[in-house]
Amino acid sequence: MKRMYSLMFLLLILLSTPVSAFDDIERRRDQFGKDFGYFVYPIASTIPGLGTAQGAGATVLNIGKTDADFTGFKLVGDFKASGYALLDLHAIPRRLIFDVGYYDFEVAPVVYNRGINSDRNDYILPSVQGSYGIVQGTVSFWERMFEAYVRELRGSSRLLRVSDKNGTAFETFDTSKHDERVDTVGGIIDVTDDRLDPRKGIRFEAAAKFPIIDDPNLSKYYVTDYNLTGYVPFRKWDTLAINLFHSDAHVTREASTDYAELQKQIGLGCGQLPVGPDRDQCLATEATHINERIAQNKYGTASSLGGTQRLRSFDGGRFYAGHASSYGLEYRLNLTDERTPFNIIIAKGVRTGVQLAFFAERGTVFDSWADQWKNMKTSYGTGLRIVLSGVIIRVDASRGDEGSSFLIFINYPWSMFSVDNPG
């Protein structure tokens, strides 16, 4: 809990610091851009834990000399996904802003056991199909230096099949469609020189996520996330970014933690299989599944580590528990730093920079506070960033305790929300 209190203390300092202390930090450009641009581009996306997919995307920036953007994409391969979003729709210019989006998917993520000590070779492969919509309303002040938002994610999903690590499919599981909803309330204090590409200053974001849970076999809980990032310039052409992240789950209504009762409710039906190796494997997987549910009902599940945002060498969602903590450093060297208009038929806009990045991250998850710092996982690597007017193309190559990863994604790391983790 000390880490959470530290973040809250830093927030109080920020809120109580006189405005004059930040007089030397001014926005480098208008935070509500008007530079029209569009991009039609092939996509070869690699997301740790999901695999590789190919497709195409299109983005239109600052439509009709406004701040509104449109983006859409479609991917097929190891996973299928498509999405469409309208961003920065101003109901009240520069004050009340809305974002809306729709996404559908068919994925088979690698799902590991709970905890920081979970075995990398012990996992299941649930194939999931679903779709969801997102609506967010934001009130903004002082060139987007302070914002508060409410966000709703609503959709549905269902299991198509479940396989073990050897590809053996389980015959008995729930294939019915389940509705999903997550309501989020959050705020951002962004005292930096630029929202998209900060070079100096500090940014703090806090959010509370409220999953709507109607299943009587699941505990009700909510999640609080805290994300603090500082940007320290050394010269005109480089910046050191420092990030501290913490997430807690808070159980408000505890469901059953009795093994026998949960076996009746969520068991895999292994008793229907004939005695033999397949049944033994099913029983072992069922035991893991039920023990996972017991821990989830007792502690809840905070935001996970691994994937595109934190501990980038690990699969998405690799580590999860009732609490999560991580910190990271990223040194960004600006190879070019000028506004360069371009128009190549399938793309038009303004390139504002190309960066080389070097990063290192450490993080852990835990159910008991006594275990907070007992086992930390490490990830480090190098990357390339292409900064455009309104979006950043990011390429990362990283290594860690469980191997290496290559990632192509959009925008800087350490975000609270991303395309692969919108809730």
Model-flagged regions — what are they?
Residues V185, L196-G349:
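C-terminal outer-membrane beta-barrel translocator/porin domains of Gram-negative envelope proteins
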Residues F22-F36, I63-D69, A91-I97, F141-E147, ...:
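Short loop/turn motifs that connect adjacent beta-strands in outer-membrane beta-barrel proteins
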Residues A44-T46, A56-A58, G72-V76, Y84, ...:
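Transmembrane beta-barrel strands of outer-membrane/channel proteins
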Residues E26, V110-R253:
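Transmembrane beta-strand segments of outer-membrane beta-barrel domains in Gram-negative
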Residues G77-W142, Y149, T168-A169, A241-S304, ...:
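Outer-membrane beta-barrel translocator/channel fold
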Residues V185, L384-L388, S404-G423:
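Outer-membrane beta-barrel "beta-signal"
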Residues T46, V60-N62, D88-A91, G137-E143, ...:
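Residue-level signature of outer-membrane beta-barrel architecture
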Residues A21-G101, Y149, D174-R199, A302-R312, ...:
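Outer-membrane beta-barrel initiation region
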